[in-house]
């Protein structure tokens, strides 16, 4: 069964590698604007005009390949459907947001209220799909289990909304989000194999394959960005996978980078309002803080490659620690 997932991953990666250049050509041919650049970060000046919405390619390819594989290998289960649904619907939200920004020149895209309402609705539907295949509504913490009944629906909504936006914040420099999420998903692939949840493993490996294919064009200097269509989908997918594998708490370690990125923004905003304009960090999310010199006081900060490598290694180490703790209990 693991081999089936690996084959799906390789197919997804190859199709993504073939599809991305054509997507980039489409953007250039239509002379569409790229993802907005940060004026405060001089290193980002060269990114102006770089195509975005690349997540559309790896999301669609991952969805199609995993669906075909699930039907062929008999893994079209409630768990697979739930993961597939969340990944697809969060991609739809991101696609609409990107579409308004890029094609309609509406800088704001979807409003915060529109995004939140859509995410809540997806969370509610996800709860009912998940409940069809689950007899209990249990949250797992190490060796303890907590059956929270109907409140599990609220947990799913909060979990999905929180993690989707956290990954969205992490997608700020070349290659950062794509490989960080790939590492996180690899940890969940290990858990899926250990518990023989090959239905969930199938879509996990398909998404990893898509991310690796996308990274070929997203590493520094990026030829394309994933956009909200990619980052929101990946965050929601990570959240639902942790639930489906009954390993919710592990995401706090496996996804520590996303937590830190989000907390840096929250702390910055709160401190800015409290002090009337003072800042804790040079810029948030925190990866931009390191780009601008961090706490060193120097004008020159870390290169994007250095930030990527540090964040990837941090995620890999914490993922291993999370797995060790998980299997110990």
Curated annotation (Swiss-Prot):
It is an enzyme of class 2 (transferase). It comes from Lactococcus lactis subsp. lactis (strain IL1403) (Streptococcus lactis). Disulfide bonds: none annotated. One of its GO terms (biological process) is cell division. It catalyses: UDP-N-acetyl-alpha-D-muramoyl-L-alanyl-gamma-D-glutamyl-L-lysyl-D-alanyl-D-alanine + di-trans,octa-cis-undecaprenyl phosphate = Mur2Ac(oyl-L-Ala-gamma-D-Glu-L-Lys-D-Ala-D-Ala)-di-trans,octa-cis-undecaprenyl diphosphate + UMP. Its cofactor is Mg(2+). It comes from the Bacteria. The lineage of its organism: Bacteria, Bacillati, Bacillota, Bacilli, Lactobacillales. Its main location: membrane. Its EC number is 2.7.8.13. The chain crosses the membrane at residues 1-21, 53-73, 76-96, 109-129, 141-161, 173-193, 198-218, 237-257, 309-329. Catalyzes the initial step of the lipid cycle reactions in the biosynthesis of the cell wall peptidoglycan: transfers peptidoglycan precursor phospho-MurNAc-pentapeptide from UDP-MurNAc-pentapeptide onto the lipid carrier undecaprenyl phosphate, yielding undecaprenyl-pyrophosphoryl-MurNAc-pentapeptide, known as lipid I. This is Phospho-N-acetylmuramoyl-pentapeptide-transferase. One of its GO terms (cellular component) is plasma membrane. It holds the Pfam family Glycos_transf_4. Keywords: Cell cycle, Cell division, Cell membrane, Cell shape, Cell wall biogenesis/degradation, Magnesium, Membrane, Metal-binding, Peptidoglycan synthesis, Transferase, Transmembrane, Transmembrane helix. GO terms for molecular function: metal ion binding; phospho-N-acetylmuramoyl-pentapeptide-transferase activity. Belongs to the glycosyltransferase 4 family. MraY subfamily. It is found in: Cell membrane. Pathway: Cell wall biogenesis; peptidoglycan biosynthesis. InterPro entries: Glycosyl_transferase_4 (IPR000715), PNAcMuramoyl-5peptid_Trfase (IPR003524), PNAcMuramoyl-5peptid_Trfase_CS (IPR018480). The keyword Iron does not apply. CDD domains: GT_MraY. The keyword DNA-binding does not apply. It is a multi-pass membrane protein.
């Amino acid at each position: 069964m693991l081999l089936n997932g690996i084959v799906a991953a390789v197919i997804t990666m190859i199709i993504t590698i073939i599809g991305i250049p054509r997507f980039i050509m489409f953007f250039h041919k239509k002379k569409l604007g790229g993802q907005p650049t940060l004026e405060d970060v001089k290193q980002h000046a060269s990114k102006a005009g770089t195509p975005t919405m690349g997540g559309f390619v790896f999301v669609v390819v991952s969805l199609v390949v995993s669906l075909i594989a699930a039907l062929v290998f008999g893994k079209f289960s409630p768990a697979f459907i739930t993961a597939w649904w969340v990944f697809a619907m969060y991609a739809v939200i991101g696609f609409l947001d990107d579409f308004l920004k890029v094609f309609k020149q509406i800088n704001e895209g979807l409003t915060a209220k529109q995004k939140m309402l859509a995410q809540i609705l997806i969370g509610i539907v996800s709860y009912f799909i998940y409940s069809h295949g689950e007899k209990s509504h249990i949250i797992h913490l190490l060796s303890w289990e907590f059956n929270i009944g109907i409140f599990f629906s609220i947990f799913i909504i909060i979990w999905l909304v929180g993690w989707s936006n956290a990954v969205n914040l992490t997608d700020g420099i070349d290659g950062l989000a794509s490989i960080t999420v790939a590492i996180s998903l690899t940890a969940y692939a290990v858990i899926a194999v250990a518990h023989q949840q090959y239905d969930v493993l199938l879509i996990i490996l398909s998404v990893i394959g898509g991310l690796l294919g996308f990274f070929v064009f997203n590493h520094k200097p990026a030829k394309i960005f994933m956009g909200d269509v990619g980052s929101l989908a990946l965050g929601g997918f990570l959240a639902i996978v942790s639930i489906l594998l009954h390993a919710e708490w592990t995401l706090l370690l496996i996804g520590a980078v996303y937590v830190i990125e989000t907390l840096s923004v929250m702390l910055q905003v709160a401190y800015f309002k409290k002090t009337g304009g003072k800042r804790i960090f040079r810029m948030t999310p925190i990866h931009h803080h390191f780009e601008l010199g961090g706490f060193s006081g120097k004008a020159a900060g870390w290169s994007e490659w250095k930030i990527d490598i540090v964040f990837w290694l941090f995620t890999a180490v914490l993922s291993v620690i999370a797995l060790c703790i998980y299997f110990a209990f």
